[in-house]
C-alpha cells in the first residue's frame, strides 16, 4: 500500500502536490534544491543552473480568480493580474494555511530516482538526494515529479548562420532581468511568445530601437476584455468551449480571427499568424501594439544570417549596427534524475498518459505534475493532476491497461498536432476546459449540470455561462468544499474590489440577462435530450 510519497520540487506543482498527499492521508516528503518555495515565480537577481528564471517585471497572464487553488481563493484586495512577488505572497499564505513547509527539505537536490529491485510487486523507488555535500538514499512508495519545464533553455544557434562572427552580445531570455543598461542600444528579440513580447516592450522604452523576428507571427491579446473584465474570465466559459467543440472548425477559426482582430488588425501590424487555422496560444501583452504604433518596435521576418554587426532577414532586408540579440526561443525539458525510458519524447511527442503517467510501468507509482501547457491557467490544472495522482497511488482510482493508455497517447498527440501544430513550442499544449473535465471525471469531481439546473438553477447558469474556474471542481466528489458555491457566486465582487478604489454613487440594476441565460441552458438540455433519444 502506498504511504510515503517523494515530491520533487517546491514550486506551484510541488506545493499543491503536498496538499494533495495530505488530503489523501499520504506521507509526503518534498525535496527542494533551493532555500525557499515558489519555483519559477520566486524572482532572483542571479541566474542559477537547474532553476527556472524570470525577469523582474513578470506579471501573470491569467487572472486571480482563474488562477487560485480550488478551496483557497486569493484575497479580494489582490489585483486581478499579479506581479510575481504578489503571486509568491499567495503561495506563502497557502503554504502557511495548510502547514506545508514542515514537509519540505530545502537545499536538497535529487540526484537520481530508480526502481527498487522488487518494483514489479512493490512499486517502490530508491530516491538518492544530496544535501550539505552528503548523499543519502530513501525508499518511497510513489514519486511526484514537480520540477517544471522552464529550466533547460532551447537555444538553436545552429539555425542562425554567422552567429559565431557576430560581435555584439547575445543570450537566452532566461538571462534577462532588467532593462537597465540597454539605453541607446539596437536590440533584436528572436521569438514572439509571451516572454519575447514582454522583453521587447520593456526594452523599447530605453533602447534606441528594438526589432522582433518571428517565423510564424502570433495573435496578440490584451488582458482586458469585454466590459473591462479579465480576458480569461470571458474566454474560458463552458458555453464558449461547447461552441468551439460543436461548430465546424472553419467557423470556429473565423470567429477566433474576428475576436483577435477586434483590438487591432494583426495584418497591418505584421503579426498575423502564418497559419491562422492552428489554435496556437495567443501572446498576452497590453503594450506591444502601442510600441509598434510608436515605431519603438519593428516586426521582422526570420533571420537568414548574421554578420559582425548586422542581421540579414529572409525578406532581404538588413538591419545594421545591432548591439544585442535576445533569444526568446523557449525551453526544452529534461529530468536528469530519471531513467531515459520513464519520460519519452520522440518526434515532439510526449509518451505520458494524460500528460502524467508513464504507461509502461508495472505499478502506477510515478506521476509528472505540471508537464503541460494548457490554453489557460496552469494552477488549477496541476491541482487536478495532483488530486488524481494521489488517488491513483492509493488505489482508489485505477489506470487502464498499457495498450489502452498507449492508444490514448497516440490519439491525443494526433489531435494536438492537428490543433496546435508540430513546432517544439507546442509539444505540451492542450485545450483547457476539456482537459480539466477529463481529470475531474477521473476523480468524480465534475459537476452534473443537468441535475444542477433543476436543483440550483442560479448556480447552473453561473457554471455554464460564467468563467470556468477551479471552484467548480470542489462542488461534488472527494475533497468537496462547502465554500465552493459561495466562491462561484461572489467572484465578481473579488474582481471589482481592487478596482473600485474611488467611491461612486451608482444605481443598482438587476441582472436582466439571467432569464435569457436560463432559457438558453434549457434549450441546450432539450437539444441534447432529443438528440440522445433520436427525435
From Swiss-Prot:
Catalyzes the oxidative metabolism of numerous xenobiotics, including mainly therapeutic drugs and insecticides that contain a soft nucleophile, most commonly nitrogen and sulfur and participates to their bioactivation. It is found in: Microsome membrane; Endoplasmic reticulum membrane. Coiled coil: none annotated. InterPro entries: FAD/NAD-bd_sf, Flavin_mOase, Flavin_mOase-like, Flavin_mOase_2, FMO-like. GO terms for cellular component: endoplasmic reticulum membrane; membrane. It is an enzyme of class 1 (oxidoreductase). Belongs to the FMO family. FAD binds at residues 9-13, 32, 40-41, 61-62. This is Dimethylaniline monooxygenase [N-oxide-forming] 2.
Amino acid at each position: 500500500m502506498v504511504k510515503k510519497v517523494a515530491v520533487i520540487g517546491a514550486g506551484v506543482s510541488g506545493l499543491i502536490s503536498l496538499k494533495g498527499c495530505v488530503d489523501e492521508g499520504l506521507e509526503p516528503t518534498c525535496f527542494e534544491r533551493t532555500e525557499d518555495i515558489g519555483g519559477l515565480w520566486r524572482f532572483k537577481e542571479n541566474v542559477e543552473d537547474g532553476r527556472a528564471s524570470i525577469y523582474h517585471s513578470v506579471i501573470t497572464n491569467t487572472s486571480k480568480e482563474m488562477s487560485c487553488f480550488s478551496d483557497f481563493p486569493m484575497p479580494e484586495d489582490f489585483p486581478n493580474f499579479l506581479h510575481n512577488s504578489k503571486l509568491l505572497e499567495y503561495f506563502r499564505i497557502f503554504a502557511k494555511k495548510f502547514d506545508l513547509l514542515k514537509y519540505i527539505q530545502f537545499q536538497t537536490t535529487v540526484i537520481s530516482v530508480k526502481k527498487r529491485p522488487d518494483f514489479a510487486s512493490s512499486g517502490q523507488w530508491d530516491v538518492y538526494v544530496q544535501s550539505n555535500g552528503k548523499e543519502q538514499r530513501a525508499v518511497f512508495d510513489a514519486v511526484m515529479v514537480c520540477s517544471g519545464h522552464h529550466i533547460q533553455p532551447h537555444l538553436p544557434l545552429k539555425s542562425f548562420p554567422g552567429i559565431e562572427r557576430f560581435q555584439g552580445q547575445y543570450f537566452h531570455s532566461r538571462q534577462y532581468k532588467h532593462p537597465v543598461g540597454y539605453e541607446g542600444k539596437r536590440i533584436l528579440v528572436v521569438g514572439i511568445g509571451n516572454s519575447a513580447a514582454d522583453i521587447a516592450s520593456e526594452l523599447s522604452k530605453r533602447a534606441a530601437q528594438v526589432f522582433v523576428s518571428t517565423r510564424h507571427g502570433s495573435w496578440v491579446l490584451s488582458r482586458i476584455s469585454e466590459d473591462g473584465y479579465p480576458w480569461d474570465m470571458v474566454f474560458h466559459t463552458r458555453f464558449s468551449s461547447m461552441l468551439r467543440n460543436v461548430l465546424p472548425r472553419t467557423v470556429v477559426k473565423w470567429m477566433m480571427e474576428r475576436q483577435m482582430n477586434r483590438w487591432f488588425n494583426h495584418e497591418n501590424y505584421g503579426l498575423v499568424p502564418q497559419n491562422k487555422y492552428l489554435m496556437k496560444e495567443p501572446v498576452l501583452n497590453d503594450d506591444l501594439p502601442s510600441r509598434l504604433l510608436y515605431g519603438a518596435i519593428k516586426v521582422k521576418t526570420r533571420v537568414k544570417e548574421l554578420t559582425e554587426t548586422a542581421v540579414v532577414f529572409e525578406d532581404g532586408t538588413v538591419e545594421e549596427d545591432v548591439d544585442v540579440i535576445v533569444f526568446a526561443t523557449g525551453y526544452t525539458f529534461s529530468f536528469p534524475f530519471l531513467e531515459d525510458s520513464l519520460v519519452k519524447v520522440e518526434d515532439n511527442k510526449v509518451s505520458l498518459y494524460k500528460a502524467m503517467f508513464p504507461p509502461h510501468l508495472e505499478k502506477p507509482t510515478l506521476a509528472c505534475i505540471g508537464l503541460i501547457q494548457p490554453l489557460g491557467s496552469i494552477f488549477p490544472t496541476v491541482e487536478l493532476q495532483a488530486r488524481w495522482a494521489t488517488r491513483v497511488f492509493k488505489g482508489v482510482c485505477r489506470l487502464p491497461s498499457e495498450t489502452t493508455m498507449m492508444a490514448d497517447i497516440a490519439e491525443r498527440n494526433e489531435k494536438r498536432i492537428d490543433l496546435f501544430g508540430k513546432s517544439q513550442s507546442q509539444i505540451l499544449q492542450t485545450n483547457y476546459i476539456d482537459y480539466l473535465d477529463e481529470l475531474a471525471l477521473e476523480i468524480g469531481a465534475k459537476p452534473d449540470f443537468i441535475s444542477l439546473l433543476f436543483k440550483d438553477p442560479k448556480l447552473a447558469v453561473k457554471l455554464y455561462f460564467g468563467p470556468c474556474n477551479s471552484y467548480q471542481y470542489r462542488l461534488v466528489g472527494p475533497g468537496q468544499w462547502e465554500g465552493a458555491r459561495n466562491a462561484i457566486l461572489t467572484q465578481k465582487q473579488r474582481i471589482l474590489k481592487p478596482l473600485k478604489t474611488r467611491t461612486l454613487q451608482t444605481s443598482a440594476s438587476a441582472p436582466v440577462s439571467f432569464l435569457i441565460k436560463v432559457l438558453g441552458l434549457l434549450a441546450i438540455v432539450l437539444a441534447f435530450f432529443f438528440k440522445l433519444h433520436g427525435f
